[in-house]
Structures are given as structure tokens and as C-alpha cells.
Amino acid sequence: MQNMKRMKANQAHKWPVPERIESLYRTMADALGPTGWWPAETTFEIMVGAVLTQNTAWSNVDRSLAALKAEDALEPHALAAMEPERLQELIRPSGFYVNKSKTVQSLSRWYVERCGAAPEGAAAISDAELRAELLGLFGIGGETADDLMLYVFSRRTFVADTYARRLFAFLGFDVPAGYPAFHKAYSPVVLSTSLSVRDLQEFHGLIDEFGKAYRDDAAKSESFLGVSLTQNGAQ
């Protein structure tokens, strides 16, 4: 019954079905190979990077992370206790450093107090509750919360970012406006696939790498997806 309702909803709104998502993942994985996402030495580095990458290039994030490492400060207890002015100085290359410093410290304190500074500390928290808690922290929006869910806490989720929006729109599917609506519409479909956490991590990386390489519809049409996927339409 649930599958029938989902199929009818997909047809009405022209959303992809789970099999289409899996086919897309396999095609992209075969063409682009392992992406290695998320690039980091520790899960906490992923957490901080997910905040710093908001509205900036990754090269700027790398500079900020390098500065934190040079201070031996890329550790949750250290960042939770650091003087805000010092943290702002270290992450200045990432831009919006005042607000980002508040977010980094809010997230660090939550991670220490709620999770014991380890991903395993959140094991007893349900997916819905964990996402709600992350969204309740200063400066954490939907995309950042889903990045953390997927890459830090190893929860199956769909990162409905700009690159995903552009890709599915190019493939002829309806894409609801705004991150919350897009995530809400596509998450049930993505989570109905057989893709594992690791697959979904890689899928997000593949989507973003594809989006960076093929920035507009003309370029996408000439890519490996242009012929093989657009011929299938919204199956």
C-alpha cells in the first residue's frame, strides 16, 4: 500500500522512483569513480568543515582548517573553550567568521555534552531527533545538518543541495523550491533504495563533482549523463 501511494505521488509530481536513483548512482559511479568524499582526517574535522564551507570555496576552508591544525585546536574540547576572538582570527579565510565561529563553538559544545565528543555517543538518538537537535543549533541549516548526519553520524539521508537540484531538474524531474521542500519530497524516494550509508556518501560526492565539472545544461547534455539518462526520461 505504501509503495503504491509513493508511486502515485511520484507520477503526479514527476519525481524519480527508487530504481531510477539507483541507476543514476551506478552510472555516475562507473563514470567518475570513487570521489573520496568527505576529505578529512577525523570526523570532527568533517563537522568543522561542514560549517566553514557555507557560502565559500573549499580552498578557503582548507586554509582555515590548516590554521586550526597549526594551533592544535581542531578538537571539540579545544574549540568549545577557545576565546571567540581567537577562533574568528583562525577561520577568517572562510568568510562570515563571526557567525561561523559562533556555530563552530555551539556545535562543539553540543558534541561534547550530548555525544561525549564521539559519533558513537549519538547512537541511541533517533534520526529524526538527531536532525532536529542539529537544526536547533545556531547557524545549522538543513544542508549542513544533513552533511553531518551522513558523514559524521553515518545516518542514511539525502543532501538536497544546489548541485542535486540542478541535476534532477536537468533530468526532467520536478524540483520543489527551497531546501526543506526538496529534501522532504526526495528523501522518501532515496531512502527507499538499497543504497547504503557509504553509497549515499559517495552519491553526494558524485553529484557535487559532476555539478562542478558540468556547470550548465549545455555542458550536462554533452556529458556521459546527457545521452544515457535523458533518453530514459522520468522513469
Role assignments for model-derived ranges:
Residues 10-234:
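Catalytic cores of DNA base-excision repair glycosylases
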